[in-house]
Amino acid sequence: MADITVVKRDGSQQPFDANKINLTLLAASEGLPDQIANVAQIAAELQLTLFDGITTEQLDEALIQTAVQNVKDDPDFDTIAARLLLRTIYQQVLGDYTNEIELKKLHAQKFPIYIRQAAKEGLLDKRMADSQLFNLKKLAAALDPSKDSLSKYLGVVTNRNRYALRRQSGDPIEVPQFTNMRIAMGLSFNEANPTEAAIDFYRHMANLEYSPGGSTRVNAGGSFPQLSNCFVIEVQDDMASIAKSIRDTMFIAKGTGGIGISMNKLRAAGSPVKTTNTESTGPIPFMKMIDTALFAVSRKGKKAGAAAAYMENWHLNFSQFLDLRQNSGDPYLRTRFLDTAVFISDEFMKRVQGGQDWYLFDPAEVSDLNELYGEAFSRRYQEYIKLAEASKINRFEVVPARQQFRQILSSLQATGHPWLTWKDAINLRALNNNTGT
């Protein structure tokens, strides 16, 4: 491969050196069985990805991906890929090193510099660099890069891509143990001894004994310290509540939170709107608005916020809800970022088992069904069926319960949605059911 030129990080060029690649692979596969065979396989497959003018970064990534594509055949390649990726991260953030002792020293030397500089640039909370709160030298001495070996490749790459702090330019400024210590410090501001508390937190995370949620990993210690991971929104059947729910979704997603949004109270399409003497468009277009809001604040290069819209399967627009995640159809009635989930009752499953019909209603006419579960739901649902059959309910549809259940399962198989949520089982076992259904 003498005709291949590699462009180094400083812009200089040098011929591709297969011996350097082999030495790197030998180090990454140290202690593993079939070391020589694995090195030879990766080195041979790497040749297929090379081209003249390849950069050091591209070469590193090609080496890693060559190892990753072999994980399906031998899990030892996962270890090799993780070690190669860690080596790349260390060099990007800390610089060159020759052994584990030097690597640990670099961690200890660079950590206080990283904290102070990031706080100065506004990337971290200024309290992180406050000497009255934290002894940075002591925290740096507690860093243990050997703990990185506990993580699989997926853990290392996920931390790099989603959670590790970066500058606006995209340049990484955290190695994995910097990330763990930053999180530990961000959770220790209000402790009696923040330094000792941070070290204790850190050790549990480094040993994989405790792993905080995604929002905590992204935001702890940062200038936007939103640490909560999960939120619940119930959209009421009025324009103010709908608009507020979209706004709340945007701000929660900005902070990487996950949201469960109940859309079940929104009246069905065609239901009268008295204030404007028109008909409602139903809940589907508003779900599309939430979907667009999620995309607009998706935090490129970081963990994104996520949301799932929930609907009960007696809603008159449930068939349109089932189609939200389909690839074909009107794009204004499809969601690409908003997940969907269906609340399924025991009453429905009994009707599936018994081959009975299932009635769909407009929430505007059966508003209390949303708040009921178990036997109370079944009794009230059956009362509404009698009212419908007596023509005392204006808008309803009747479908075979088994037919709808097949539609749900077909959609789940085709799109992965809607997620099945067993309403009665959850509410009967909920420890905080005093807060509502």
Regions picked out by a protein language model, each given a short descriptive name:
Residues M1-T437:
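Extended catalytic cores of very large enzyme megasubunits
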